[in-house]
């Protein structure tokens, strides 16, 4: 039971200290109780200012908007409008889709998903307030289990299929009101979409006058090594959905959009909590601190080193499987490989580094191994998460303030947990995974 926390460290009621690499699901960009966040919140509380104002303008709101505009991609910042909505990312996505529907007169929404995962994606928030709209889900090239194969063929196939849908050439699917793009699909097991493919989606939507909605709920505010994940590919969206870390640890969500899409009245969203002054103050302080201290760049460099170390660990323990991510958004997907070959090789002598240690096709994900690894991490004082829709993926979301020394401590504890899981599995089954070997053609 946690009773105190500061930065990366959480202290339990028993006095034990934990390293928190879940960060409230990514909401704590600066870690627990960062001084700049606490100071900003105290300042509002001590001022006697109203804490909830719905759509009224306030100095706190103006300061948040001004700081947010400083961080936006240049192509959007100069003509951006900021719309506040309910504090959940689902409410922000609903508001963004409703805006696109009102601007285009169309109803449907297209979203991309890692469609070949074992677990189907959950429902996508859509439509305007109180309405429902059809959502068409298209596969994105994610290099693992995509129906279009791998490499360039995968990206080309996914792009051409998307173009067919957006042109209205697929029976039963009309031209959509908007296209939702998430540069790193966090809910879809930390899948990083190719930058080239993202640029092609941007060109495709622009050529057809279809608003591109960048969902930065999970990826924004420096998490991936750029302030906004779409900046890795140079994509400038028409609409951005922001939540999670944008509130500086407090509930806040906003929709940023081009001025020519400003077709709805300010009070179109009826959510009660869209004017939270404490969240706006904490959010403005967080945005400013990350910008001024270049924490996105820090996340890029340190995240790359963490990924390298984790891939080295996967080379020693093939069942660790796939290590992927960007910046400080990292996923580890344990798998059930065929261990007939030597360590670091797949069946039939597949070379080290082949996907999941398998020669012909990916090994199945092993949710049991991921859960066991999470438990062993916790026993060693390391808090990590599991994918919401894909519990076979271990998620690491440390605060952007994590130091190189702290990262080494995290990696040491994780490596120790891997060794413990491996030893137990081998003792009971003779295989590291404890699961059947990878299927062969």
Place the predicted regions along the sequence by residue.
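Conserved N-terminal phosphate-binding loop of PLP-dependent enzymes in the Aspartate aminotransferase
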Residues: 1-441
